Amino acid sequence: ATVFCNGRRVFHHGCGYTAFTVDLTEALRLGEKNVLAVRCDSREDLNIPPFGGQIDYLTYGGIYRAVSLDVKEPAYLRDIFIEAQAEGDFRIYTSTVGETVGCTLQAEIRSPAGSRALYDGELSLPIVGTLNGVHPWSIDHPFLYTLTVRLIRPGTGGLPDRVLDEKSTRFGFRTIQFVAGGLYLNGQRVEVRGLNRHQSYPYQGYAMPDSIQ
């Protein structure tokens, strides 16, 4: 897919099976009508997956998943990621964009029951901590926590602090190991079974709503 803004080519993404983000800031015209266009090309290219090997399904063209337009502050969170072990140890990584000098990060972990633990600190990474008494994620009991990270600019002159951006992701506390004997989840060997599911439907192809997927 190739993205154009006001006739200007701003981004090209060489795969139809992965998400991508485009920064339109430099191509936008403030106070005017802007035209955003996406050109999709489904011709076979041996350098772009899944082509280059044998496949047993059709590769349609077009946009068949959600597209959103996000309005951001000049400084914002590009991405957040958490590594969490079954014992409760965790490490949070973040990626920011823009001028973040003087800003702080606030990380909040919340369980499905609503209990939470707060971690505040200057913009130094990674954020490392431990939660006691966590419920490990497993296949039979997929217990998920929610991590929320906020980028905050402290207020000046009596003004309150301002949240510039906020991102959330769900995760589980678990330990996974691939060794010669197989796959081990939280120290227990597990058998992994899967299937190959194609999402092509008669008369609709891939363009089906979430309720049917």
Predicted regions and their residues:
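Secreted/periplasmic carbohydrate-active enzymes, especially glycoside hydrolases
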Residues: A1-Q213
